[in-house]
Amino acid sequence: MIHFKNILLATALLAAVLPASAQKHSISSLTDTKATVKAMETIIAKNDGHYVEPIIAEICAKKKNNPELCVGAADAFWYKTGIRDSTNAFKYIKKAIAANKNYVPAYILTAEIWNDCQDTLKAIEWYNKAIQADTLYAKTYRALAKMREKSGNYDEACRIYKRAKAAIPTFPANLEIARMYYKTDTYSGYNKAIEHFKIAEVDSMEAYDYNSYATLYNLAAEQVQDRGAKVGNYLKMLEISEEGIQRFPKDFYVLEAGLLAAVKIHDMLGQSDAEKKREYAEKAENYGERAIAEGDTLVNDVIYKLYGFALKYRHKYDKAIKVFERVLNSDKAEEADKDIAMKQIADSYKELGEYDKAEELFKNNLAKKEANGTAKYFDYEKIAELFMDQAQELNGNDKIDVLWKADAMYAKGAATDLQYAGYGYYNQIRIRSSIDEDNKKGLGLEPARKLYAMMLTKGALEGNNKKIMVYACNYLGSYYHFTKKSPKEAKQYWLKLYETDPTNKNAILVLTKLYKMKL
């Protein structure tokens, strides 16, 4: 006798499964199978298997143990109950196989259950039974290969995919292998992914495959130092992106890949390749505009930054400024991207001859950082460089006035951020030397002395520290020797210059010829 609760559940199940017209009759039509499976999943998930199973048995019996229905019930007992009811799952799998011994999903589900129970050998056994039941059922090969892939057995997964290709000539084995190796997140895996993408079944490639394939060449470009090799990788990235764009013209990710590749190629080409740079700038603008149009919520600050570059390369400065302002004012943008955006806005203003707007932009940003104590040397350097660029377009006192503005920024940067103070002093010497070309006024003495004293505290000097110390010694030695006519005072600087750089021609010449020293 059926329990009272079972009767209620059965009634609910039948009502949920059948349309009104069909409820007048028995569950006899297989057209209701998918709806029946869906309803059973809901009932099994929400009720105790002890009460539900007799109802499921009755429904399956009325459907003559339709294999799809039985496997649907088994799947629900295993995946939907929360307790992994293997007893009932296997019970309905057996019913499915009894009804149709070649019904592959029954074997696949059995393999999944054994794999979930960590019995790999049993799982493999049942996957192979599934293949024997139907060698042309592609899902079996994929499921078995992915199980091996998940355990890190990539060679075995490759063998299974190739086995599928042998049985089903249209099976995209190389594409599946490429996808598998792409997910390894290792450079050896990436190289294998590239090899298989090259021979992948193009007709089966989805938009995300083109994006993955293109991304691999972006990663390859980042790993090489040779400029030619970098350009070659970015060109391949663009080629793949454009193939993807042809097939999926509205896909955001392939458009994004095309945008990035075009910007990278443009940046790597020299000024002698002006025509090619224009070509890639046009491509970048095109793909950037389309990516933003199609991306909706996917569009992020990096996309706007790249699109801003494209517009700037196309000399569309007003439009570029607006795009970069989106990045600058975004709450989600990285600080590094905001700094890039601000510099690009300033550069665009400079191209438009609007130095005052660029200066205002930098100073407003600097004021905010000074207020919260986060201002660094490079914040001042940006403004100084702006003044230096402006000075190149001026003459006479106008030029000198702007150079002194740059000098003041370098001085503030050095005073604010001692870690980089040496660069500030170095740039002050350069500016003051350009104002006082013959060094008669000694305008560079103050920063040169500060730089010299700072470098004395650093011990052995290398790289940029060595470079700026050489500059300071040259300035001080020349000033005291030739302007102040004090060889005695100058000697310490020439000696320090030689000590810092024994190959320095000025030091060698002065010490051997003027001081008659043997080096």
For each predicted feature, which ranges?
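Bacterial Sec-dependent N-terminal signal peptides
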Residues: 1-27, 244, 514
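C-terminal interaction modules of eukaryotic adaptor/scaffold proteins
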Residues: 488-507, 517
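Terminal low-complexity, poorly structured segments
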Residues: 9-10, 14, 212, 324, ...
